Structure formats: C-alpha cells, structure tokens
Amino acid sequence: MHCFLGREILSFFCLTVRKMWLKFILAILLLHAAAGKEPEPQYVLMVPAVLQSDSPSQVCLQFFNLNQTISVRVVLEYDTINTTIFEKNTTTSNGLQCLNFMIPPVTSVSLAFISFTAKGTTFDLKERRSVMIWNMESFVFVQTDKPIYKPGQSVMFRVVALDFNFKPVQEMYPLIAVQDPQNNRIFQWQNVTSEINIVQIEFPLTEEPILGNYKIIVTKKSGERTSHSFLVEEYVLPKFDVTVTAPGSLTVMDSELTVKICAVYTYGQPVEGKVQLSVCRDFDSYGRCKKSPVCQSFTKDLDTDGCLSHILSSKVFELNRIGYKRNLDVKAIVTEKEQVCNLTATQSISITQVMSSLQFENVDHHYRRGIPYFGQIKLVDKDNSPISNKVIQLFVNNKNTHNFTTDINGIAPFSIDTSKIFDPELSLKALYKTSDQCHSEGWIEPSYPDASLSVQRLYSWTSSFVRIEPLWKDMSCGQKRMITVYYILNTEGYEHINIVNFYYVGMAKGKIVLTGEIKVNIQADQNGTFMIPLVVNEKMAPALRLLVYMLHPAKELVADSVRFSIEKCFKNKVQLQFSEKQMLTTSNVSLVIEAAANSFCAVRAVDKSMLLLKSETELSAETIYNLHPIQDLQGYIFNGLNLEDDPQDPCVSSDDIFHKGLYYRPLTSGLGPDVYQFLRDMGMKFFTNSKIRQPTVCTRETVRPPSYFLNAGFTASTHHVKLSAEVAREERGKRHILETIREFFPETWIWDIILINSTGKASVSYTIPDTITEWKASAFCVEELAGFGMSVPATLTAFQPFFVDLTLPYSIIHGEDFLVRANVFNYLNHCIKINVLLLESLDYQAKLISPEDDGCVCAKIRKSYVWNIFPKGTGDVLFSITAETNDDEACEEEALRNIRIDYRDTQIRALLVEPEGIRREETQNFLICMKDDVISQDVAIDLPTNVVEGSPRPSFSVVGDIMGTAIQNVHQLLQMPFGNGEQNMVLFAPNIYVLDYLDKTRQLSEDVKSKTIGYLVSGYQKQLSYKHPDGSYSTFGIRDKEGNTWLTAFVYKSFAEASRFIYIDDNVQAQTLIWLATKQKTDGCFQSTGILVNNAMKGGVENELSLSAYITIALLEAGHSMSHTVIRNAFYCLETASEKNITDIYTQALVAYAFCLAGKAEICESFLRELQKSAKEVDGSKYWEQNQRSAPEKSHLLDHVQSTDVEITSYVLLALLYKPNRSQEDLTKASAIVQWIIRQQNSYGGFASMQDTVVALQALAAYGAATYNSVTQNVIKINSKNTFEKVFTVNNENRLLLQQTPLPQVPGKYSLTVNGTGCVLIQTALRYNIHLPEGAFGFSLSVQTSNASCPRDQPGKFDIVLISSYTGKRSSSNMVIIDVKMLSGFVPVKSSLDQLIDDHTVMQVEYKKNHVLLYLGNILQKRRKEVTFSVEQDFVVTHPKPAPVQIYDYYETEEYAVAEYMSLCRGVVEEMG
C-alpha cells in the first residue's frame, strides 16, 4: 500500500495506517483487560415512552448471560416522588418478564424518568431515561339525527363519553350549548348527565333561523370542549339521484370518451325522462381575452334502465393542444317525464400527458445483507388502473438487473439477492417506456415517467439481522395470521449454542399488548425463517407495532420492527339488521340488534335522500378511533414534548469504519439506519447495554437532541324493516288486496335507545313510513364492561310495486278550473290491468281528459291520467284518488292467470280554493264585567260594500279573561308578514306578558307554559339574526349599515324579561348594554342612530326626548336599578326636559310612564294631570290620539284607528298602573281606558300593527293582574229571530278557553245576554274579501308583465314589473310591503328573488302561501321605485283569473294602493283546456 508521496516520505506512517495500528493495539489491550474479569450480563428493559395517567402500565425486563446474583430495581421518578416499579434479587436469565404497575394521576402533561439499576459482585449497571405521563381524559362524541335541517324542524342529538379503552364514562357536563352561525348561544343545558351513559337532547329551530352551520358545543368539567356541526338550509329532498360515470382523466392521445348518465329513484327504480348533456373545454384566459368554451351538447331520452351511455369524439377538444385548460367539464341535467323537477350532476375530467406511471410498492427502506430484498413494481394508467402483461426493467445502482412482467393487477414482484452486495446504499430504478424527447411548440407530448427508490444498508456490528415480513393489507379482528420472520446470525459466540431465543413485543395505542418467545434451532444453519402466530383483537387496533429481537453474545441487540394496520374494531360486537331487505310502506318490520348483554344501544334510521342532499361524516369506527389521543405512538416526540435521550455509546472519529468486511460511515446525527431506529419507532423506551446504534461522529456539529419541550415539529402519529319484485303469491283461488294510504313522510324515522337483554339480543317492531325510499339505519352500543361498539349500516327499501302519485297546486281562485295529473307506476315484473278512480265530491266537478279508459300498464312503465277540475266552493277541498289492479288476465299474459293478489293505493291531497279579491276583517269587542247581574245588548253585523259574493264568514266568540284571546293566538296576533327584526318582536314580546300575567294570577298551566316558551325560544333564535357584531340590532340585521338605538333598547329589555323563562346569552346582553351606553350623551339623553323603518314606533316624532324616555323605560323594565349610571344620567335628561313645555302627546305619555315606573310620584302625577286635559271620551271609554284625522284623509280600504293612538293610550294606562301609591280611583280611570283599547283588538287578540300590539298587551296584562278576580261564573247567550241560538258557559275551569261559533247570516241582527259574576270578553268578527277598490291612499302602483315565453311543450315563464311611489302626507313612508299574489299555477323563480336582495333592490323577500312579500325600506315622497322578478308555471290552470298586488305601509296600513295582473301565457293555457 502506498501511503506516502514526495516530501511526506519523512512521515513515519500515513494517517490511515497509523489509525489502523492504534485501533489494533487498543483492541489487544481491551482483550487482555476483559480476560481479567467476568463479563457483565446483557439486559433489556422496556417501558412505553408515554404513560397514561391514573391507569395500569407494563414494564418488561430480560437478562442474558447472567451468572451471578444481582439486585435489580426499577423506579418511576415524578414530581419529587419516587415510585418503585420493580425490586428483586435474581440469579438466572429467565427470559422476558413483564409486570403491571400503576401510573400516578397527574393534572397536565408531565415529564418523568425511569431509572434502572442492577448490582452484582463484579458490576454495577445504571440507566435513566425520560418518559411522559399523559393525563388521559375521556373523549366525547356528538351524533345528530340528520346532517341538515329545515327551518322549523327539531334537532335531536346524543352525547357520549368514552375512556381510552373505549368504555363508557358517566360524565357530568357542566354545559352543553348550541351556537348559531353568528356564534350566538341560542340554547344551553347545564350539569347534564345520564345514568345510561348516553345523553339525548332535542331542541326546535325557529321557522326563520339564520341559515348556515350551527355548532353543538359540549364542555367537560376539565374545561375541554368538543364541538359538532350541522347545517340549516331551506331544501327539498331529492326524489332521485343522478350520477355521471366518465373517466377520471384522459390522455392527450385518447380519441374518444364514454359518458354514462344514470337517474335512479331513492327506492331503487329507474327514472323515466330525458337528459341534457354538455361536455366543454375552456380556454386559458389571459388579461381581457375571453373565449367561449369548446362544447359538445345534446338532449336524449333515458333508456328503460334510467341510464344513457354516449360516446363522444375528443377531436373537437384538441386534447394535446396548449392554450386550453387541462380538464373537461361534464354537466348532465335530468328532467322527469311530464314533470318540471330536474336534478343536475357534474364531473370534471382531467387531461394528462402521463400515459402510464410506475411506483414501488411494499418495499423496505433498508436492506439487510444476506436476507433477500423483496418488493413490487406497479404499472398503472392515467386512471390508476393496472396495466398487465408489460415488461418492466429494473436497474440496481444503474445496472440492468432483470426484466419483470406485470400480472393482471399490473404488479411485477421482484427480489434482490443481497448476500454479495456491500454498498451502503442501493439505488433502484424501474423503467417501462422512454418518453420521446422531441418537442413541438404548442403541442403536449405524451410521457412515461419512471420510478426511483433509495435503500440504505442496515447497520449491525455483528452483521446479524432479523427481518419481519410485512403485511400490506389491513388485518381484521378475530383473524389468525402467521407472521414470517427472516434471520441471519453471525456465528461468532454460537460455537456451542444450538438453540437461540427470539422474543417479540407488540405495542398498540401506547400500551404493550403482546409478548412472546420463539426458540429456533440454528445448529444446521445460522440463517432461515420462523413463524409467529398472531390472533388479531381489538386491543391491537388501529395499528400494531411488532418488535422481534434477540440478544447476540457479541453484546448486540439484533431486531426489526414493523407496523401492521388493524381493522378498527371494538370489544362490544354490534350487529344490526332489518328482518327484511325490502318491504311495503306502512307495514311492520322488525329491527334486530345484537350486542353485549345489558348494552344500551342508540339507533338511528334516516331517509337516504338526506344523505344525497348532504353527505356527512357518518359516525363510524374511523371517527371514534380518531378521537383517541394515542392511536399509534411512533417515536419520542409527543404533544410537543421531546423524549429523545442522549446516546449511551461513546462517539467516534469521522473516518469510515471497516468491520467484518464492510465499511460503515459514522453518523453526523443521532438517527441512522440502525436497530435504534426500529426501537424508537415502537414508541417505547429501551434500556440496554447491547449495541443498537451506528457510531456517531465526535464533532461540535453533531446534532444533539433538542430540549424536552418543543414549540413546533412533527408529532408522534397521534390523533387526538316483505317485498320483492312481486309480493309472494297465495294459493290458487284466494285473492288478497294490498291497500295503502300514504300520509306520513318523516326524514328521520327511528331515533331510539334500546336495552339489550341478557341473551345479547333485542328485536323491536317499527311501522315503515309512507316514503318510498331506502332507509339507512345504524346503531352504537355502550356497556360498562364490554365498552363501546357499533354496527355497520343496515338498509331497508320501503317500496310499493304499484302506486299512484297525485300532483296539485297550493291554491287556486274560485271560478278557475285546472288540470290535475295522476301518474300510476308499475314496478311489478309483468303487465297489469288497472282502474283509477278520482273520488266524487260535492266540492268539485271532474272531467276525465285522458286516457279515455283504463287499460294495462306494463312492467317498469307508468301511465298518466288527467282530469279537468271545476271547484264549486271555497276553502280546503280534499282530493282522494285510488288506483288498483284488476283482472290480470285482461292483459293477455297467460302465465299470470293464477295470480291472486290485487294492489290498491290511495293518495289524499288537499287544495285551497280561495275567494277572489283581497282579504279583510272587522271586529266588535265588548268587555263586560258584573256581579250577580244580567246584561242584554243588541249586536248588528253589517255587510260592507264591494264584498266578493260568498266570501263573508261571520263568527262569535267569548272568553272569560281579558287576555284570553291573545293567549289563544299569541303566535298569530297579526295577520301580517314578520320578516324583519322589528316585526319579529311582536312574535316574541307578548309571550313574556302572557307568561308573567298567568304566573301572577296562578293560571299558568304546563300546556300554555310549554307553548309560549316554545315561541320565546323560536323568537330568540330569529332575533339574533338581526344582531350586528357590535351587539346592536336593526330591522334587517347586517344588511343595514348600523344598529338602531330604539330597536336595540326594545330587544334588550325584552330579552332581559324573557331570561326568567328561557336561556338568554349573558354575553349577548352585556355587549348590547355596552353599545347602548355608548349612545348616551353628556346631558344624559340618547342619540338616535340607524334607520328605523317604523315611524309609528317613535310616535311619529323625531326627537331625542322620546327616544331617551323609551330607553330609560327599557332599562328599568330590564331590571336595572335607579342607581345604575346610565339610568341616573338618563333621568337627568328627562327631568331637565320636564321643566320645559312638552307639547307632543306621544312624548308626554312616554315620559309619564318613565317617571311613574321609577317611583318619582310628584313628576308622575304632574304628567298624568297634563295628559288628562287632552283625553278623548266615547261611550264611556277614554283614549288619546296623536293627530286628529279629517274624514277625507281616512282610507277607503281600512277602518281602524291609527296604531299610534293605541300606543299612546296604552302608555298612559301603564303610567296609571305603575304610579306610586296607586289608588282604587286610578284603577277606575284605568278601566275606562281598557274599554277603549279592547274595542280596537282584532279577532286574534292583536291590534293594527306591531308596536301598538306589544305595548297594548303589556298594559292589558298589567291591568288584568291588578284587577284579577278568581271567581268567574257567567252564562252568555246569543240568538237571532231566525231560530239561531247558542249558549256558552264561562267558569273558573274554562275561563281561558276561547269558545267560538259561526253566525248564520250577514247582514244580521243578534241579541246578546250575559248573566252571572265576573268579566267576559265578547267579540264578533266578520272576515270577507273585497274586489279591488278604486283609488289609493298614500301610494301609487302599476303592474306590468314582460319577457313572456309560452311554449306548448314547456312551462310558461314571464317577468313581473312593479312600479310604485309614495304620495302620502309625510316626507317618506315607513317600511313598505308589496304583496304579490301568485297567479294560480305559477311560482316565483327563486334566483330572480335572490337577485333582488343581492342588488339591494329590496331589503327582504319571502315566499309564503302563494304570496311573494317584498320588503322595502322607507320610500321617499314621490320617488319612483321599480322591482322586477320572474315567475314560471308549475301547474296548468286552464282559465286563470287576475291576481292582486297590494302595496302598503306596514305600520300605517291605511296608506295603500292595489293593482292586478294577468298571465301573458293565458291564451296558450286556455287552448290546452
């Protein structure tokens, strides 16, 4: 060896030789030293790196070559406390021994240490390593009955807590809350627990909630939170599902593509209809350059199987051309035959230049010299589909080793003999085809990428290796497998040893779950294989890390570890199935559940359509396991804590090490291709004095383990119920009729908790709903010992092989006729003779148009029947249609002569027939109070002019309580829209007064309480949708620029009063109060902000005094004391103003009530005296009015007092009732006021508008509580000269019952007699329609129609153009409503309504009961307002009548205008009739 050159000949030796000699000499010296003393034994101590707090764990210990008595001690050091885990004397090597020990409880993530000592006569072994103690809390999951809800539906959900062994925990949840999309808390339940370990809760959604994602938040005692989201949207369940099947990708060389569209009903039958298909490729657009996409489109009928397959040429799309987007967009629109309903499905097809791809699979990243290296190469196409029978070239270190051919799965297995490979690294490359290196500008060339893999040689000091053969597929629970282990051992130290012990240890979820020992005879050969038997169980899920090791006499630990994926399973085995796979709707089916005895099983079954509408992350084994904080512990970094210990072995120089014929390069970091890496991957700490690491370089640059706590970095793999194609045939000569009447269509069918008996089985019978669909059921179960378990989904197809479907519009106008269509579906596998009958009725005349007679319907076909319907009267009209099979032989099918089953299906639907014109109402109210007396009175009901014939509906009612009518109608006090933040409060606030009044008078029943609280809950949810982020409220919420001071105060005080009955978020209230306080000026008065579209709410006066009085009242009614800073300053404002002359009556009434409510007697009395001067009296009653109207100013459409007058009068009444030292004389004065207020009530207990209803009911409730008499006994009789007589009895038991009767004639004169004691509230109501009146008051309105499209074979469509302006006496109107009644058979196009909001043309749009309601803000005097939207026909009405349009001031309804419009498609429709 030439180790010197030139002038360096003076060196004694070159550096390499010198180092070799030094190492040799050192080895000789060490050998002599070792001969002088007994060799120390080898040991292995194993403990999980993460110990789970307050639970048992395991430690495993082994000694090898032990030949003297030693004292062994293992200690857990934590928080200055040492806990002895293991302490004993031992003299022999007894193999691997494991024992349990208890981990102390901790409150947080804690660092601890395990110390090991072993003392003998000639040696003293010590090691100390870090571990982590993890505070393992229970984890919580939430399940809702559905993933999506409609407004007004109830949400049902469950909460379950499990420990880390998946056993149920009886948690007490301090708080379970529901948040809306704006993070407002709308429901909460405190200190919730359940003895069965399943909490089940239900709550309602308001009819008009905030749409979007809601959260259920569950808080545990520790403060840890779990959340679950669900969606609230307006939706219609899809009747069928549309799927597009197309290749996921195309290559630039593909010449065609096949697209298949299928439409299938949810009950599994094909859809009959047509499909519009378009396939498009877009250009890449740069700057302002926009090009239309290249498309192929067509429309075709679906085949009888509901599918359509079509082959398209790809030539037009120029797949290999640059300048286009690299995808095709497929869109399919399927429309049912003779229906408007359609569904759309889309798919994107990517375009790739990659013709094929190679990938190495099932390979190891290390090779062990002497053990064959196995692997697979997979060849796939652009869709990842296998390419078979192709030759793959494999290069090892850039040399072609062999050619391999792919099998039918596209896989080519390979093996490499490593016995003669010495390289520290192998470079593997797989090649299929070589890509063409020729490129043309503007064109995309195909490519065939190769695959590369780098494999490192595993380090072993003795060149001994163990390799566990991996399994690349998940193992299922209960499965028995034999695991193959390869080994090769260096013969050094085995001269006299024939049997070698191999040990194996399994880790899962951070615990030792498996240990064992295999004895192998190595006498014949030091390399070979052995098998480890493995029985998979739930303890090993979701991943088992298996370590196989042996202790080599040359003081090396030879090992390998591998990760096996295990099916996510549970100890509690749950099975769920329906007794049948298919059954008729409305029949009974059994749901059979099997689980561990005494389990409680939570079952859910939902309509498959729900899951089509919104796919959800179903509760599954996957989702439950994902909640476990330690699914698969790998490595030494957990939850930000680094548990890496310093290497025990001394470092070496940076020169390559030559040992046993191999060169090794020392590591420059602590991690390398060695056994330590396998041990580390187990997530276990290993204490050993055997070699496990590749040597590490001694340099300052050596990468040391980071500090224990990390701010970032990778973490250790943790994650926090008899149906077939036909019904079975009965014996010959016996005929059965299977009849169904369908009316129950839920979305969630089953939501139950079922107890499993001691046999481990339960069977529950359910009635299948009427929905023809597939039901998906699932169950999870909990039991204290068996723990948690869950079933795979079970399905039931609820189906009718024969049924009829009737389609009706929502309503029509009296005098119109329309076409009704019934479709009869036959899903039997043979033709049948049918009879279809529309039940005769006195309410309509029906004329069959087609077909001319009944006939046969063949298999998988439907038949349509059409009648022309002529309604005779008004009101709800019921249509009952029955379809039945009859006389099968008439269809000339010989094989069916012996069938003895008939089918009959009936469907009942209702249609509203409305009178023409506009609905109106007049009432007469009488509050009669007496004591043992008789009162008689004549009552006349006159008929107004311009009444639509047949529309008047007079009635008479009586109730024994001043609040009785309002209590019965608290949800419908006004027959007006409620689509904004002001109007919603009329649905909310009166419930508070009703509850408070009934509570004070001890009349509150559970039924009334439940109903009114339900309304409060709903109103609370809805009102939050009008809240701004700063805590204020406005009419249309965030659509308004800022919150409104007046409305915010109203909401604040109402929520405060409601908090006695329902949950109100304190944080919401606190934020609102802060906002109100910021609006107070230095003089104590409040500034007005925001636009309030109700001038009446402000008494028509734009001044800060009325606002300040109102806010002061609100804060006092909210429960704040006079010492509150805001209130104290507010009264400074009011007292200063009271020293001046306040002339406005509305402001006087407000200020009077404020001072009376605050107990300021002198000022209160002063204002009441002043108000008395302006009081009006009529028929013994007293009231106040804002401005006296002259006769010409009064509306021809309505005849009631101004709502402001009711409001003022009510405030005066409240002032009287709350004045300090109230006297009997005050109550007498109050009774006269009450008489006048009562006379203004409508038939539902409300008044003319919003604020007058709220304040008047508050005042009436206060008066009723102050004058309540518990004794009521009255007999009321009403009669007429035409033999009509009706007698009512009112007593203490039924005083809140609203008793009603229709009156026989109008116009008419009636006599009324009241006899007894107590008060009764009597009312006559006349509801009627009027023809559109001429003229207008306050508004102008015109309606135009345009852009009509009226084809014969498709639904008609046109635009409605509304042009209006305000012409009243004020500078602007209040909020305006335009009520557009839909023409019979037409519906609005939703997208056009949405556009009105998006363009800020209107503030709100509602579509209810065939009316489009458009909300406009204040309209300025004579300012033109134009609104346009589209309507389309969804039903054929053959002789349609005009539809009315009304515009009116919501708060001053006497200001109005009316108009009407007709369909531009009328001529075409009338020809069809």
UniProtKB/Swiss-Prot annotation:
Q: InterPro entries, from UniProt?
A: A-macroglobulin_rcpt-bd, A-macroglobulin_rcpt-bd_sf, A2M/Complement_sys, A2M_N_BRD, A2M_TED, Alpha-macroglob_thiol-ester_cl, Alpha-macroglobulin_TED, Ig-like_fold
Name where it mostly resides: secreted
One family name in Pfam for this protein: A2M_recep
Q: Which sites does the entry annotate for glycosylation?
A: 67, 82, 89, 191, 342, 403, 527, 588, 757, 1141, 1221, 1315, 1347
The answer to whether keyword Amino-acid biosynthesis applies is no
From the UniProt annotation, give the residues forming the signal peptide: 1-36
Q: Which UniProt keywords apply?
A: Bait region, Disulfide bond, Glycoprotein, Protease inhibitor, Secreted, Serine protease inhibitor, Signal
User: Mind telling me which Gene3D superfamilies this protein's record contains?
Assistant: 1.50.10.20, 2.20.130.20, 2.60.120.1540, 2.60.40.1930, 2.60.40.1940, Alpha-macroglobulin, receptor-binding domain (2.60.40.690), Immunoglobulins (2.60.40.10)
GO molecular function ontology, one term from the record: serine-type endopeptidase inhibitor activity
Task: Give Gene Ontology CC terms.
Answer: extracellular space
Consult the record and explain the modifications the protein receives after translation: Lacks the thioester bond found in other members of this family. Glycosylated; contains 56 glucosamine units per subunit.
Q: Where in the cell is it found?
A: Secreted
Please state which protein family the record places this protein in.
Belongs to the protease inhibitor I39 (alpha-2-macroglobulin) family.
Function per UniProt: Is able to inhibit all four classes of proteinases by a unique 'trapping' mechanism. This protein has a peptide stretch, called the 'bait region' which contains specific cleavage sites for different proteinases. When a proteinase cleaves the bait region, a conformational change is induced in the protein which traps the proteinase. The entrapped enzyme remains active against low molecular weight substrates (activity against high molecular weight substrates is greatly reduced).
State the oligomer form and interacting partners. Homotetramer, which consists of two pairs of disulfide-linked chains.
The protein's name: Ovostatin
List the source organism.
Gallus gallus (Chicken)
